[in-house]
Amino acid sequence: MMNGLVVKRGTEFLARKQCRSAYADEDGFNWSEELQAARVYQNHETACRAARRVGGTVRLMKDGRVVE
């Protein structure tokens, strides 16, 4: 079963998960510790994996920035 999809689009990578996750709270998206760490360390692979896990969407720019 595939949990997520990573698509390259021009200068960014889009990581998303089709189903909602337990990490999403009633106020909207809630960053997990793993995704927060990915934002700090700007690690594309970690951010993609974390985005799929928490059911959110992140853009991973070529210059290394991880943005919501």
Q: What do these predicted regions represent?
A:
Residues 36-68:
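Short, mixed-charge low-complexity intrinsically disordered segments
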Residues 2-37, 66:
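Short aromatic-glycine-(Arg/Gly/Cys) micro-motifs in beta-strand/loop hairpins
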Residues 1-2, 61:
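Detector for methionine-enriched segments
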